Amino acid sequence: MSTIAIVDYGMGNFHSVARALQHAAPDADIRICNRPEQIDAADRVVFPGQGAMPDCMRTLNESGLRAAVERAAASKPLMGVCVGEQMLFERSEEGDTPCLGIFPGEVRRFAGPQFADPVAADQAAAAPPAAARERLKVPHMGWNQVRQTRSHALWEGIPDGTHFYFVHSYYAAPSDPALTTGVTDYGVAFTCAVAAANIFAVQFHPEKSAEHGLRLYRNFVDWQP
């Protein structure tokens, strides 16, 4: 039986993630973990997060779990969710916060105002004026389409263009385009899923994304990177 540690550093919807994983993978041993040795002993790790980045990084550091997360990222399947995905990068514009630096790149805020139907730079002259386009609110909240930019085992059984549930004001901007495995449009086309080696991370919430979110968690449990 695979043991999956959900990292509990005090800033995340850990119980919702645990319930979704239990539903998606009833054969797995799901544990909410707040001690380094529990994370070290697990076969797989889910790293969720929600809230302000300065608070998330502070509580992760104060909890004593940072090194365990870094060890997991270097050695076993790890899935980041929402702020857990963002924390994998080098820094965040939110409070100019240093992050884990596992992936190259930064976390940026949606620049306001946002408008629907993002426009490519070479088409800007022909684009309708902003007043004629739908104004988008920040935070980005609700269902949105994910375009799979490259194949990955965690996309197995999930159609390209599937909608997932988002709640966020910031998004990851990888320095290495090869990290991106999913993109979503919200005024700007932004990276919403990244993958490299034994790590897969998403900006959206699989636990709030109905059957396809559960399938993503199931795929993570079955994944052999």
Curated annotation (Swiss-Prot):
One GO location term (cellular component): cytoplasm
Subcellular compartments: Cytoplasm
Classification via SUPFAM superfamilies: Class I glutamine amidotransferase-like (SSF52317)
UniProt KW keywords: Amino-acid biosynthesis, Cytoplasm, Glutamine amidotransferase, Histidine biosynthesis, Hydrolase, Lyase
Catalytic activity annotation: 5-[(5-phospho-1-deoxy-D-ribulos-1-ylimino)methylamino]-1-(5-phospho-beta-D-ribosyl)imidazole-4-carboxamide + L-glutamine = D-erythro-1-(imidazol-4-yl)glycerol 3-phosphate + 5-amino-1-(5-phospho-beta-D-ribosyl)imidazole-4-carboxamide + L-glutamate + H(+); L-glutamine + H2O = L-glutamate + NH4(+)
Gene Ontology molecular function: any one: glutaminase activity
EC number: 4.3.2.10, 3.5.1.2
A Gene Ontology biological process term: L-histidine biosynthetic process
Domain Glutamine amidotransferase type-1: 3-225
Database matches in Pfam families: GATase (PF00117)
Pathway noted in the entry: Amino-acid biosynthesis; L-histidine biosynthesis; L-histidine from 5-phospho-alpha-D-ribose 1-diphosphate: step 5/9
CDD domains (alphabetical): GATase1_IGP_Synthase
Active site: 82, 205, 207
Assembly with partners or alone: Heterodimer of HisH and HisF.
Stored PANTHER family: IMIDAZOLE GLYCEROL PHOSPHATE SYNTHASE SUBUNIT HISH, IMIDAZOLE GLYCEROL PHOSPHATE SYNTHASE SUBUNIT HISH 1
Function: IGPS catalyzes the conversion of PRFAR and glutamine to IGP, AICAR and glutamate. The HisH subunit catalyzes the hydrolysis of glutamine to glutamate and ammonia as part of the synthesis of IGP and AICAR. The resulting ammonia molecule is channeled to the active site of HisF.
Name of the protein in question: Imidazole glycerol phosphate synthase subunit HisH
